[in-house]
């Protein structure tokens, strides 16, 4: 009896493999929802709640994005020391907590700080930790798996916009 090889399969990853794929897809979903599209969608409502303009909130988002990249670099160093699995969980939790701070910020300073932390941590969860998880879990099918996981970007845009 010939066993069928999954060498050429693009779906035979097993339950644990699909769990990882969906987990990483959701990290990208939240990244787009919190940062890329989400920050533009909430700017008007946040500005109204703070008594400022949407343009000011967009400026805060730009500053937060630059600060988020700095956080991203710091998390990269920590990621190498304690591992991608632990860091992805830590980053997702921090991003969720600080996003609540974004939505409830009393002024633009608090908003910018919370958005910077949210940006840096959710970006780190998806790109730094997620990339390492894919490389470790799917050493021979990284490209196919990254194709599935990055669908989170497009699905989030379709849902949020």
Question: What is the predicted role of each segment?
Answer:
Residues 29, 109-125:
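Hydrophobic core of transmembrane alpha-helices in multi-pass small-molecule transporters
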Residues 85-88:
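Primarily marks hydrophobic transmembrane alpha-helices of the MFS/SLC 12-helix fold
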Residues 141-161:
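Glycine-rich segments within core transmembrane alpha-helices of 12-TM secondary carriers
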């Amino acid at each position: 009896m010939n066993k069928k090889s999954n060498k050429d399969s693009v779906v035979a990853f097993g339950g644990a493999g699909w769990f990882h794929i969906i987990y990483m897809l959701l990290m990208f979903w939240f990244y787009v929802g919190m940062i890329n599209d989400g920050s533009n969608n909430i700017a008007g409502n946040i500005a109204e709640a703070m008594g400022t303009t949407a343009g000011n909130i967009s400026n805060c988002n730009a500053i937060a994005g630059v600060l988020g990249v700095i956080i991203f670099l710091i998390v990269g160093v920590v990621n190498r020391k304690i591992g991608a699995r632990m860091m992805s969980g830590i980053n997702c939790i921090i991003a969720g907590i600080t996003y609540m701070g974004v939505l409830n910020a009393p002024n633009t300073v608090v908003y910018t700080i919370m958005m910077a932390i949210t940006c840096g941590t959710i970006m780190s969860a998806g790109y730094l930790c997620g990339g390492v998880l894919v490389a470790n879990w799917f050493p021979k099918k990284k490209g196919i798996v990254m194709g599935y996981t990055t669908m989170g970007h497009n699905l989030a845009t379709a849902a949020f916009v």
